[in-house]
UniProtKB/Swiss-Prot annotation:
Keywords: Cytoplasm, DNA damage, DNA repair, Hydrolase. This is Uracil-DNA glycosylase. The keyword DNA damage applies. The lineage of its organism: Bacteria, Pseudomonadati, Pseudomonadota, Betaproteobacteria, Burkholderiales. Belongs to the uracil-DNA glycosylase (UDG) superfamily. UNG family. It comes from Bordetella avium (strain 197N).
Length: 252
């Protein structure tokens, strides 16, 4: 049975108010607070009109990480627009949800460099716990209507969040997949020390397309090689896979 991931009426403003104070710099930037108020009002109006909006926790990507704790940024575009899918983390869905095609290609690319043993878990929370920010540029969507809340104010908010992370003095990795994400490179400060890796979006429509195919890009390995040079702990990209005990392990 699919998890009920519908956003409840009159909850988005409270979720925004409960964000860690470390994000307040971005949310207090000129025009950002107004944009956030605008999108909250739009979402509440759509809910009052009977629309189904996903996910239940649009700001989840920010609730577990402060900007200084972010080590890797992966940008998505729009939450999944089907029931039981979106959970507030870019590309991530609950473990019992069918694996979306883009996430399947992400796992395929990881598997080129790392052994994927066990049952794949589609919930990418284990990455978040290691400092990976999984941020969509629009944070809500209506059922069956992709990009329905794009251009409603979310981009102003998420651009400010991206900028705050990019201005943090600790170097980070930015994985920019597809033209939409790559356009955000313009928000990086001049002379930054970050590692920026670009490739096509992992969608089946573009994952193997030249000149910068996603499949074969090596971004997960390159990220860890760079983190190692920085003296940082590597990301366990296989952490979402659930170990299946061998038959012998059940013996007494």
């Amino acid at each position: 049975m699919a998890i009920d991931n519908r956003l409840l009426p009159n909850t988005l403003a409270a979720q925004a108010a409960a964000l860690p104070s470390a994000w307040s710099q971005a949310l207090a930037a000129p025009g950002v607070a107004q944009a956030l108020d605008h999108i909250i009002n739009h979402v509440e109006a759509r809910l009052a009109a009977g629309a189904t909006v996903y996910p239940a926790t649009p700001l989840r990507a920010l609730s577990s990480l402060a900007p200084s704790e972010v080590r890797v940024v992966i940008l998505g575009q729009d939450p999944y627009h089907g029931p039981g899918q979106a959970q507030g983390l870019a590309f991530s869905v609950p473990d019992d949800c069918k694996c979306p095609p883009s996430l399947r290609n992400i796992f395929k690319e990881i598997g080129r460099d790392y052994a994927l043993d066990g049952k794949p878990g589609h919930d990418l929370t284990p990455w978040v716990k290691q400092g990976v920010l999984l941020l969509n540029t629009a944070l809500t969507v209506e059922d069956g209507q992709p990009a329905s809340h794009a251009k409603r104010g979310w981009e102003t908010v998420t651009d400010a969040l991206f900028t705050q992370v990019a201005q943090d003095p600790t170097p980070k990795v930015f994985l920019l997949w597809g033209a939409h994400a790559q356009a955000k490179a313009a928000l990086l400060p001049p002379g930054h020390a970050h590692l920026v890796l670009s490739a096509n979006h992992p969608s089946p429509l573009s994952a193997t397309r030249a000149p910068t195919p996603f499949i074969g890009c090596g971004h997960f390995r390159l990220t860890n090689e760079w983190l190692e040079k920085q003296g940082q702990t590597l990301i366990d990209w296989t952490a979402t896979f659930k170990k299946i005990p061998a038959q012998a392990e059940f013996r007494l």
